[in-house]
């Protein structure tokens, strides 16, 4: 019985081990590839739990999301013979899920070593070999990452379509200490020169600002003067218009008054012409004589009542009036 129990226990253990080796998990953002007897199977699997034949089938999980591959301490010899080292180069890339099988089949699951690491080493050495230290370290350093990205992506499009390079980041290379000090001194001098240039620009900017302020102030004064001048001109024009209106009104009033006076005089003259007839004048004459309380003496008194042609006789009668008055006064004195 004990022997049979041991056999049963061994069988259960084997079954448990087989189940344990058959069940596996693929993480999110990964693709599972399978090997049987060392041969890559065409079957791939996505995230989750999966089953496979125990003991004879194995799997590897290949990342298909963004990942960063680091290449460290890359040597590089410049055209001048100076050996420099790039401490760290980071390549951000991702693998398209549909291309996982072909990439793994052609370059194994560690495809990044064959396709990325080696290409970075090759491109950096090519770049350094045709440029001197000044160009690599300072002048062209900002172009290295972009050039590496373009060269790497172009090579991958031919050899392994499905790998996308998103970015390449290159750290400043390490250079010999003596050369580094010289570069530091040179950078210090450049910094001083830049500071001096910036100070000069600041002074020029301040002068330009002052000039613009003066121009703005002058323009403001000119605009104010122009506004005042226009205001005065408008006031004078307004006064002129008011004066013209007043003159026009005065002329109109005077003309109206003259027209009225002329009309009145004309009407009066017309009325007098119609009124002062010879008969009416004769009547007025008689009324005036009748209203006179004085007594006239003389032989020509009757002639006063003649027509206007007897004018001289009337005058002589008047003279007689005066003489008679004188005689009257003399007679009074004698008495």
From Swiss-Prot:
Regions of this protein lying in the Lumenal compartment: 24-335
The keyword Glycoprotein appears for this protein: yes
This protein's UniProt keywords: Cholesterol metabolism, Endoplasmic reticulum, Glycoprotein, Lipid metabolism, Membrane, Signal-anchor, Steroid metabolism, Sterol metabolism, Transmembrane, Transmembrane helix
Organism of provenance: Xenopus laevis (African clawed frog)
Sections of the chain in a coiled coil: none
Residue ranges of the TM segments: 3-23
Protein's UniProt name: Erlin-2-A
Its job: Mediates the endoplasmic reticulum-associated degradation (ERAD) of inositol 1,4,5-trisphosphate receptors (IP3Rs). Promotes sterol-accelerated ERAD of HMGCR. Involved in regulation of cellular cholesterol homeostasis by regulation the SREBP signaling pathway.
Taxonomic placement: Eukaryota, Metazoa, Chordata, Craniata, Vertebrata
């Amino acid at each position: 019985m004990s022997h049979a129990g041991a056999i049963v226990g061994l069988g259960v253990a084997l079954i448990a081990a087989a189940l344990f080796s058959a069940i596996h998990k693929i993480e999110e953002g990964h693709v599972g590839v399978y090997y049987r007897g060392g041969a890559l199977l065409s079957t791939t699997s996505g995230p989750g739990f999966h089953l496979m034949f125990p003991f004879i089938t194995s799997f590897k999980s290949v990342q298909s999301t963004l990942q960063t591959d680091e290449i460290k301490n890359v040597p590089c010899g410049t055209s001048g013979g100076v050996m420099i080292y790039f401490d760290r180069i980071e390549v951000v890339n991702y693998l398209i899920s549909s291309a996982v099988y072909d990439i793994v089949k052609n370059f194994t699951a560690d495809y990044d070593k064959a396709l990325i690491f080696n290409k970075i080493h090759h491109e950096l050495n090519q770049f350094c070999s045709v440029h001197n230290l000044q160009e690599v370290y300072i002048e062209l350093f900002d172009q290295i990452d972009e050039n590496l990205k373009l060269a790497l992506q172009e090579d991958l499009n031919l050899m392994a379509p499905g790998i996308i390079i998103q970015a390449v980041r290159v750290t400043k290379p390490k250079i010999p200490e003596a050369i580094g000090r010289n570069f530091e001194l040179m950078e210090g001098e450049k910094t001083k020169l830049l500071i001096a240039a910036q100070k000069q620009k600041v002074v020029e900017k301040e002068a330009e600002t002052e000039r613009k302020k003066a121009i703005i102030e002058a323009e403001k004064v000119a605009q104010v003067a122009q506004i005042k001048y226009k205001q005065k001109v408008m006031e004078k024009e307004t006064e002129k218009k008011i004066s013209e209106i007043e003159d026009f009104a005065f002329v109109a009033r005077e003309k109206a008054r003259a027209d009225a006076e002329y009309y009145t005089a004309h009407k009066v003259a017309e009325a007098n012409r119609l009124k002062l007839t010879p008969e009416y004048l004769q009547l007025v004459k008689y009324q005036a004589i009748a209203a006179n309380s004085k007594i006239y003496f003389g032989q020509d008194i009757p002639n006063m009542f003649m027509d206007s042609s007897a004018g001289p006789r009337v005058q002589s009668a008047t003279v007689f009036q005066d003489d008679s008055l004188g005689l009257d006064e003399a007679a009074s004195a004698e008495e």
